[in-house]
């Protein structure tokens, strides 16, 4: 994302904060959830209507004119708070049209995560999205159904919604179903991992992805979390995936850093040293 779009995103986020600040404290959580859901709906419409999205992102047209068009099209169809965020976004000069749409999605996600945080559900949302990624990655048939470009986005969302209904938080379901209908070049599991990481980022936590040769006990998990928290100097979320092929031990990945303490890793290192 170029400088112009980065500044436009900053202004759009500021508009979200302002919109949420304009409602009463008791209504802020519901407003955040509504803004997120409605921004997703707006993007879905813009994805389908090339002429409209081009008009709303045309930098040769004055920003106030683009804002007026947004109000003409979406006024009365979304809340006043959502419309304020949308008008702020289209009034900015974005480097490319895709930056506008992707940023509306991002701000929508952040708004939904704000609602989850207000309800004390942010940790649950993060964990649910991570586990969903692992489930999909381990189910080739489901992964194919969700990633098949010949399947309409609406049908993919309906499929995932049926699978998730009543099993995860409303925010996790909303985030996941939106993402699966707009995968572009991402695999479904990767998209869900990205959402999980975004949830962790909302509470300034580091995500540690751990592969273990066997399930960790609660005590082992707590000890690992405490060790990583001391190492990185900030809260750490530990996501554990069991992988018997490791033979023993753990592989811990934090960002681009990998700590391989597995039996398979030690064997590989030994083989390399003997060459």
Swiss-Prot record:
Q: Which domain of life is it from?
A: Bacteria
Query: Mind telling me which InterPro entries this protein's record contains?
Result: ATP_synth_OSCP/delta_N_sf, ATPase_OSCP/d_CS, ATPase_OSCP/dsu
Chief subcellular site?
membrane
Q: Where in the cell is it found?
A: Cell membrane
A Pfam family per the record: OSCP
Q: Name one GO cellular component term.
A: plasma membrane
Indicate yes or no for the key word Magnesium. no
PROSITE patterns reported for this sequence: ATPASE_DELTA
According to the UniProt record, which cysteines are disulfide-bonded? none
**Which keywords, in A-to-Z order, does the entry hold?**
ATP synthesis, Cell membrane, CF(1), Hydrogen ion transport, Ion transport, Membrane, Transport
Among the GO molecular function terms of this UniProt record, one is: proton-transporting ATP synthase activity, rotational mechanism
What's the protein's topology in the membrane? Answer: Peripheral membrane protein
The entry assigns this protein to a family as follows: Belongs to the ATPase delta chain family.
Functional description taken from the UniProt entry: F(1)F(0) ATP synthase produces ATP from ADP in the presence of a proton or sodium gradient. F-type ATPases consist of two structural domains, F(1) containing the extramembraneous catalytic core and F(0) containing the membrane proton channel, linked together by a central stalk and a peripheral stalk. During catalysis, ATP synthesis in the catalytic domain of F(1) is coupled via a rotary mechanism of the central stalk subunits to proton translocation. This protein is part of the stalk that links CF(0) to CF(1). It either transmits conformational changes from CF(0) to CF(1) or is implicated in proton conduction.
Q: How does it assemble?
A: F-type ATPases have 2 components, F(1) - the catalytic core - and F(0) - the membrane proton channel. F(1) has five subunits: alpha(3), beta(3), gamma(1), delta(1), epsilon(1). F(0) has three main subunits: a(1), b(2) and c(10-14). The alpha and beta chains form an alternating ring which encloses part of the gamma chain. F(1) is attached to F(0) by a central stalk formed by the gamma and epsilon chains, while a peripheral stalk is formed by the delta and b chains.
What is this protein identified as?
ATP synthase subunit delta
Q: Which organism is it from?
A: Rhodococcus jostii (strain RHA1)
């Amino acid at each position: 994302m170029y400088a112009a779009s980065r500044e436009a995103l900053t202004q759009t986020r500021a508009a979200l904060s302002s919109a949420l600040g304009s409602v009463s404290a008791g209504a802020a959580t519901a407003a955040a959830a509504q803004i997120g859901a409605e921004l997703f709906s707006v993007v879905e419409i813009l994805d389908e209507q090339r002429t409209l999205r081009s008009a709303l992102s045309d930098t040769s047209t004055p920003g106030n004119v683009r804002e007026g068009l947004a109000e003409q099209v979406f006024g009365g169809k979304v809340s006043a708070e959502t419309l304020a965020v949308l008008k702020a976004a289209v009034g900015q000069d974005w480097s490319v049209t895709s930056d506008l749409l992707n940023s509306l999605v991002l701000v929508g996600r952040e708004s939904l995560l704000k609602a989850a945080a207000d309800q004390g559900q942010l940790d649950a949302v993060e964990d649910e999205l991570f586990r969903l990624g692992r489930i999909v990655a381990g189910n080739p048939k489901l992964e194919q159904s969700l990633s098949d470009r010949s399947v309409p986005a609406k049908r993919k969302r309906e499929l995932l919604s049926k699978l998730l209904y009543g099993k995860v938080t409303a925010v996790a379901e909303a985030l996941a179903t939106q993402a699966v209908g707009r995968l572009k070049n991402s695999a479904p599991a990767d998209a869900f991992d990205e959402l999980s990481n975004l949830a962790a980022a909302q509470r300034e936590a580091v995500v540690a992805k751990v592969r273990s040769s066997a399930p960790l006990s609660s005590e082992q998990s707590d000890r690992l979390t405490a060790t990583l928290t001391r190492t990185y100097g900030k809260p750490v979320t530990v996501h554990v995936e069991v992988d018997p092929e490791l033979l023993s031990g753990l592989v811990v990945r934090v960002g681009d850093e990998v700590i391989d303490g597995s039996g398979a890793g030690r064997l590989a290192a030994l083989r390399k040293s003997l060459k």
